[in-house]
Design a protein with these regions (language model features):
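Non-catalytic surface loops within mature trypsin-like serine protease
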Residues: 10-12, 58, 92-95
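Intrinsically disordered, low-complexity acidic/polar segments
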Residues: 15-17, 49, 61, 97
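Glycine-rich beta-strand-turn "strand-cap" elements at beta-sheet edges
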Residues: 39-48, 76-100
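Short, surface-exposed ligand-recognition loops at beta-strand->loop->(often short) alpha-helix junctions
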Residues: 9-19
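Short, well-ordered beta-strand segments in beta-rich or mixed alpha/beta enzyme
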Residues: 2-9, 39-66
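An amphipathic, aromatic/His-enriched active-site/gating alpha helix that lines ligand/cofactor pockets
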Residues: 24-36, 55-88
Length: 100
């Protein structure tokens, strides 16, 4: 499994628009081969941070996302709203179990 976590900040007034943009792209991203999850979170610690958590089958299935129209569109909309550089952390992970 491949996990990518993206954190970025916007002005407080821009965060709803940033969240809306990511929600707009969610369906297309979830439909991509190998995507297991795409979750967007507004920080409870402040009014400017947004976190996106991606889960993919593997790193190879993540790569087409980086070249996708959804990624490009979101970048065009989100980057001007960002008040600093985004931070993307990427992990290889092994699922041990799913407990329901």
């Amino acid at each position: 499994m491949f996990i990518a976590i993206l954190d970025f900040q916007t002005a407080a007034a821009d965060r709803p628009a940033a969240l809306a943009q990511l929600e707009t792209e969610r369906g297309q991203i979830r439909a991509m081969p190998g995507n297991l999850a795409f979750r967007v979170y507004a920080s409870r610690e402040d009014d400017s941070t947004v976190t996106v958590v991606h889960e993919w089958q593997d790193e190879e299935s993540f790569k087409p996302y980086l070249a996708s129209e959804a990624f490009i569109r979101s970048g065009e909309v989100l980057r001007p709203m960002m008040t600093g550089s985004p931070v993307s952390r990427r992990f290889h992970a092994e699922l041990l179990e799913t407990v329901a």
